[in-house]
A protein has these predicted regions:
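N-terminal Sec-pathway targeting helices
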Residues: 1-17
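Membrane-interface motif at the C-terminal end of an N-terminal transmembrane signal
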Residues: 14-34
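Short N-terminal helix-initiation segments at or just after the protein's N-terminus
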Residues: 22, 26, 69-83, 127, ...
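Short, conserved active-site entrance elements at the starts or edges of catalytic domains
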Residues: 27-88
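Short, structured beta-strand-loop surface elements
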Residues: 39-54, 110-204
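Generic detector of short, locally flexible boundary/turn motifs and exposed helical patches
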Residues: 43-44, 56-72, 99-103, 108-113, ...
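Short beta-strand segments
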Residues: 74-116, 143-144
Length: 204
């Protein structure tokens, strides 16, 4: 019993030290190739803390974000969400810039379609519980608040008129839902307003 306690304590200490190191160094999510992503069942290794210089200036035009729009590239944009157990969960994400507005988009496909929103992805659940997120774009960190776009017509507009519920036909001629798209509007937080000096968005 004494040996078991020593081993257990050693394992706990190693885990604590490892987490402290990762808190300082960061652990970004994996950036697999498109082929590897599909082979892994449309999944990629999640990360923990994202590291980078935090941007404190308000962004008035997000169109430049398009250059980081390839989620499979090493410079793809990343999202850090807050878990209930206190250790961040980060993933690569697809961003949709619309001038002064910025959106996140994500889809449920294959096995995830069998789960009700937001249970299809861990980060969806995290954002629904706590909308305070951090985006890493071009090596810099943006503290944001993510708000789900619940209006299906608005999501269709963001998708260029395409329905967020995508239907396909199987080999037997039967129609089925093959994709379900979700969008979040993201707002900067902890940013001084231009004139009032107040802080924009929710604070930590």
């Amino acid at each position: 019993m004494k040996l078991f306690k020593v081993v257990a304590l050693t394992v706990v200490l190693i885990m604590v030290v490892a987490l402290l190191v990762l808190r300082m160094t960061g652990l970004p999510p994996g950036h697999p190739s498109a082929e590897d992503y599909m082979t892994a069942g449309r999944s990629a290794r999640p990360g923990l803390w994202l590291k980078g210089e935090v941007v404190r200036e308000a962004v008035t035009n997000w169109d430049w974000v398009s250059q980081f729009g390839d989620a499979f590239a090493e410079n793809g944009s990343e999202l850090e969400t807050r878990t209930w157990y206190g250790i961040p969960h980060s993933v690569t994400v697809l961003l949709v810039p619309r001038g002064e507005e910025l959106y996140l988009m994500s889809s449920a496909q294959t096995f995830r379609l069998g789960r009700a929103f937001p249970d299809g992805k861990a980060w969806w659940r995290n954002v629904e519980r706590d909308p305070r997120v951090r985006l890493k774009i071009g090596g810099e960190i943006y503290e944001m608040t993510a708000v789900l776009v619940r209006d299906r017509a608005e999501v269709a507009r963001l998708r260029g008129g395409r329905d967020p519920i995508v239907r396909s036909i199987d080999d037997n001629g039967n129609e089925y839902v093959s994709e379900e798209w979700h969008y979040w509007r993201v707002f900067q937080r902890n940013i001084p307003e231009y004139d009032s000096g107040m802080t924009a968005g929710a604070s930590d």
